[in-house]
């Protein structure tokens, strides 16, 4: 059986790691040991931050919606509650986009949310209505 030497494979692996470490600063871009550690860490950061990006964008959308809704005289929580009671199911990404690019449509959404909140306030019985004074 022929002897297997790993030179070609090792060289290919090293080239692959150094290719991934392009653009890194200092020793991290040209020594295998430092580059391997830096590349591994960068992959961990990339994995973590793909999850964080979703949270960050959701928070941004909520801030934008809140700002637009407050200009209409309502709070974010009441607005979302009104939309759900009105049966309007639009996600926060689309709502923030509408608030920025289509203010008239957004005003109509706010009006329908307010209407749903007012309607439900008028129809729900008061808990203290039958209480003796």
Swiss-Prot record:
The keyword rRNA-binding applies. Transmembrane segments: none annotated. It holds the Pfam family Ribosomal_L20. InterPro entries: Ribosomal_bL20, RIBOSOMAL_L20_CS, Ribosomal_protein_bL20_C. It comes from the Bacteria. One of its GO terms (biological process) is translation. Disulfide bonds: none annotated. Gene3D superfamilies: 6.10.160.10, Ribosomal protein L20. Keywords: Ribonucleoprotein, Ribosomal protein, RNA-binding, rRNA-binding. The keyword RNA-binding applies. One of its GO terms (molecular function) is rRNA binding. One of its GO terms (cellular component) is ribosome. HAMAP family: Ribosomal_bL20 (MF_00382). Binds directly to 23S ribosomal RNA and is necessary for the in vitro assembly process of the 50S ribosomal subunit. It is not involved in the protein synthesizing functions of that subunit. Belongs to the bacterial ribosomal protein bL20 family. This is Large ribosomal subunit protein bL20. The lineage of its organism: Bacteria, Pseudomonadati, Pseudomonadota, Alphaproteobacteria, Hyphomicrobiales. The gene is rplT.
């Amino acid at each position: 059986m022929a002897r297997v030497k790993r030179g070609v494979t090792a060289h290919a692996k090293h080239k692959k790691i150094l290719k991934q470490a392009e653009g890194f600063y200092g020793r991290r871009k040209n020594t295998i040991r430092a580059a391997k550690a830096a590349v591994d860490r960068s992959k961990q950061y990339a994995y973590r931050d793909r999850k964080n990006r979703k949270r960050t964008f959701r928070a941004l959308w909520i801030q934008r919606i809140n700002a637009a809704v407050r200009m209409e005289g309502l709070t974010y929580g009441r607005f979302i509650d009104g939309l759900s009671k009105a049966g309007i199911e639009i996600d926060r990404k689309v709502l923030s986009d509408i608030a920025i690019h289509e203010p008239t449509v957004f005003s109509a959404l706010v009006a329908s949310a307010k209407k749903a909140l007012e309607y439900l306030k008028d129809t729900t019985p008061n808990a203290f209505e039958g209480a003796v004074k």
